Curated annotation (Swiss-Prot):
GO CC annotation, single: glycine cleavage complex
Interval spanned by the transit peptide: 1-29
UniProt binding sites for substrate: E234, R265, Y403
PANTHER family named in the record: AMINOMETHYLTRANSFERASE, AMINOMETHYLTRANSFERASE, MITOCHONDRIAL
Gene3D superfamilies, alphabetized: Aminomethyltransferase beta-barrel domains (3.30.70.1400), Aminomethyltransferase fragment (4.10.1250.10), Probable tRNA modification gtpase trme, domain 1 (3.30.1360.120)
Uppermost EC category: transferase
Record-given protein name: Aminomethyltransferase, mitochondrial
Organism, as annotated: Flaveria anomala
Domain of life per record: Eukaryota
Protein's cellular compartments: Mitochondrion
Gene: GDCST
UniProt-listed InterPro entries: GCS_T, GCST_C, GCV_T_N, GcvT/YgfZ/DmdA, GcvT/YgfZ_C, TrmE/GcvT_dom1
NCBIfam families xrefs: gcvT, PRK00389.1
Length: 407
């Protein structure tokens, strides 16, 4: 899981500062020739992007700015990320909502057209297969984006259940948007910058909203969402127009929005207290344990009907045995798999993500601890490279979120 980043050499790992190496580069391939490239690959290289293996793709981990500077600039101005390695797809048909509700915990039927939500795909034991942002475009059209590292298993899972659903007469079909690229524009200048490139009034578009609109002359799927805790958008654009759109965004921001890589993206999501699948969520972790009970709609709690509902609903009623928590710690930054102990030195859990916060100038992390030891202020110890350091449980997000919502 973490081996690929070590192969990059000490020059890059030093520039990564204190970020958790495992969370950045995953599922590396044997050679550069094995890696997929987004349509912006040459654009990244021309702008100084340092390309690394990530989930089978060659992606920029950073540009000329340090990861710390890029993180802070996103919070103060804005960042543009290439997230085309992620997989966008649509489900269509009069039964697409009923079909999706068998696989995810969200109240999809309760979403108004043009709105969306974070949700979790679950397995029969209630564990998380992946997390995803889903949008109800219309009552018979759902748009969703799944993680790059989970693409193959997610698509196989959806296809398997779709075949069974259709065999019983269900009306649902799907399309995978391999012909599109995905850009994420994040930060306080995201709205004003993008407004220069569309006639759509973005001030009326709030967090979680979705539109199909013209941006810079291209038909785009626009979602007001992101992975940083800041206001921002994810823009699905025809691949042949992706480079032109990236150039236009950077130009309209007058240099304040900067290209940003995976390193800062990881720092930003950690500061925002957001899960990284494969670290903070796995197939043996339920949404309740991960602190995502809020994503399980009220109707779904009453009716169930999704995979693993019996396990998940019992955890909601009785409480889970473990819980995801935020962590502060002394010493070097905690890493994934670092042991968490109580004050007596007894094992109570494990760190899943950790790093140095560029904005808070202190070590932060996430992990799982036994229920009862999850309350903010609980003192604990973290074992890093055989040495024990003081730590404590804290609330998340570490940095306040700034999602654009109605006043």
């Amino acid at each position: 899981m973490r081996g690929g980043l070590w192969q990059l050499g000490q020059s890059i790992t030093r520039r990564l500062g204190q970020s958790d190496k495992k969370t950045i580069v995953r599922r590396c391939y044997a050679s550069e020739a094995d890696l997929k490239k987004t349509v912006l690959y040459d654009f990244h290289v021309a702008h100084g992007g340092k390309m690394v293996p990530f989930a089978g793709w060659s992606m920029p981990i950073q540009y000329k700015d340090s990861i710390m500077d890029s993180t802070i600039n996103c919070r103060e101005n804005g960042s543009l990320f290439d997230v085309s390695h992620m997989c966008g797809l649509s489900l269509k048909g009069k039964d697409c909502v009923a079909f999706l509700e068998k696989l995810v915990v969200a109240d999809v039927a309760g979403l108004a057209p043009g709105t969306g939500s974070l949700t979790v795909f679950t397995n029969e034991k209630g564990g998380a297969i992946d997390d995803s942002v889903i949008t109800k475009v219309t009552d018979d059209h759902i748009y969703l984006v799944v993680n790059a590292g989970c693409r193959d298993k997610d698509l196989a899972h959806i296809e398997e259940h779709m075949k069974a659903f259709k065999a019983k007469g269900g009306d649902v079909s799907w399309h995978i948007y391999d012909e599109r690229s995905l850009l994420a524009l994040q930060g306080p200048l995201a709205g004003s910058t993008l407004q220069h490139l569309t006639k759509e009034d973005l001030s009326k578009m709030y967090f979680g909203d979705f539109r199909i609109i013209d941006i810079n002359g291209s038909k785009c799927f626009l979602t007001r969402t992101g992975y940083t805790g800041e206001d921002g958008f994810e823009i699905s654009v025809p691949s042949e127009n992706a480079v032109d759109l990236a150039k236009a965004i950077l130009e309209k921001s007058e240099g304040k929005v900067r290209l940003t890589g995976l390193g800062a993206r990881d720092s930003l999501r950690l500061e925002a207290g957001l899960c990284l699948y494969g670290n903070d969520m796995e197939q043996h972790i339920t949404p309740v344990e991960a602190g995502l009970t809020w994503a399980i709609g009220k109707r779904r709690r009453a009716e169930g009907g999704f995979l693993g509902a019996d396990v998940i609903l019992k955890q909601i009623a009785d409480g889970p045995a473990i819980r995801r928590v935020g962590l502060f710690s002394t010493g070097p930054p905690a890493r994934s798999h670092s042991e968490i102990q109580n004050e007596k030195g007894e094992n109570i859990g494990e760190v899943t993500s950790g790093g140095f916060s560029p904005c808070l100038k202190k070590n932060i992390g996430m992990g799982y601890v036994k229920s009862g030891l999850h309350k903010p202020g609980t003192k604990l110890k973290i074992v890093i490279r055989g040495k024990t350091y003081e730590g404590s449980v804290t609330k998340m997000p570490f940095v306040p979120t700034k999602y654009y919502k109605p006043a």
